[in-house]
């Protein structure tokens, strides 16, 4: 009987091996411009929409850290007058806050997991200082700038990702950039942001770092950020309000970059790849492009100089481009002569 053995009845040991997940670095950029959020509060009719976003963001960061013990996070705020690294701090090498906080000012539960508490305390404390500085400037009557610093914060986030990736050469580290911004019915893309955002797109594509975007409020889509997500295999999500924001973050923004080619992403069906003229601000489908800084223009600038990088254009090329189209004359049909009888 022992000789009769069928391979189908033999019990084979499973060769399942546990594969450790690759650590991930999540760099979060939050647009904290008070002017944008104040306009959004008036449209919604509720105050404190920025605080609701920050609460959902902290939960999202804790969820990312809980996936793997080696996961890392970085938080950058795009303020009205620059950018601010919320976490990790400049004087913190290991990513944990060493500043002593009084018990009265501590709003984070001390019984929380240490990894979560270090991040939450640093983010809340630095945001509190940013808000204090913004309110002090308003009380002093300092005029608020109208330009956004979102593109600068994105550049700083990619710089941090590049540095951390080179510091951990022995460990493979996946990285991605998440941008949370706000929009209103009157808000639109600023023309001067096109070139910095295009530079961010080129850098992220070279580093194979996807850019994810969550836009809260607003009627119009952010054309430049849509182009960034499409070029880097990222996700673009437009949320009407802050209700259920943590659900959007924990579903659409937790899709692993390696699985995004098989998963239906919540992106828009069509992306507007047109750009804006640097001088007039009009949407341009066909225009003039500077060969140095890739500045797009709908008209030839005065002085034959690029308004962005101040490069001089070749006079022969400008004369050729300024030449109006010539319509060749059509051949006239010969009139038939009347034959008189």
Swiss-Prot record:
Gene3D superfamilies in alphabetical order: von Willebrand factor, type A domain
* Cysteine pairs bridged by disulfides in the record: none
| GO CC annotations on file | nucleotide-excision repair factor 3 complex; transcription factor TFIIH core complex; transcription factor TFIIH holo complex
Q: Name one GO biological process term.
A: transcription initiation at RNA polymerase II promoter
- The keyword Phosphoprotein belongs to this UniProt entry's keyword annotation: no
Tell me if DNA damage is a UniProt keyword of this record: yes
Q: What is its main location?
A: nucleus
Where is it located?
Nucleus
Q: Which GO terms describe its molecular function?
A: zinc ion binding
Q: Which UniProt keywords apply?
A: DNA damage, DNA repair, Metal-binding, Nucleus, Transcription, Transcription regulation, Zinc, Zinc-finger
**Where do the ZnF regions (C4-type) fall?**
290-309
Please give the InterPro entries that the UniProt record associates with this protein.
TFIIH_Tfb4/GTF2H3, vWFA_dom_sf
Functional note? Component of the general transcription and DNA repair factor IIH (TFIIH) core complex, which is involved in general and transcription-coupled nucleotide excision repair (NER) of damaged DNA and, when complexed to TFIIK, in RNA transcription by RNA polymerase II. In NER, TFIIH acts by opening DNA around the lesion to allow the excision of the damaged oligonucleotide and its replacement by a new DNA fragment. In transcription, TFIIH has an essential role in transcription initiation.
Q: How does it assemble?
A: Component of the 7-subunit TFIIH core complex composed of XPB/SSL2, XPD/RAD3, SSL1, TFB1, TFB2, TFB4 and TFB5, which is active in NER. The core complex associates with the 3-subunit CTD-kinase module TFIIK composed of CCL1, KIN28 and TFB3 to form the 10-subunit holoenzyme (holo-TFIIH) active in transcription.
Q: Of which family is this protein a member?
A: Belongs to the TFB4 family.
What name is this protein filed under?
A: General transcription and DNA repair factor IIH subunit TFB4
Which organism does this record belong to?
A: Eremothecium gossypii (strain ATCC 10895 / CBS 109.51 / FGSC 9923 / NRRL Y-1056) (Yeast)
Give the gene that encodes this protein.
TFB4
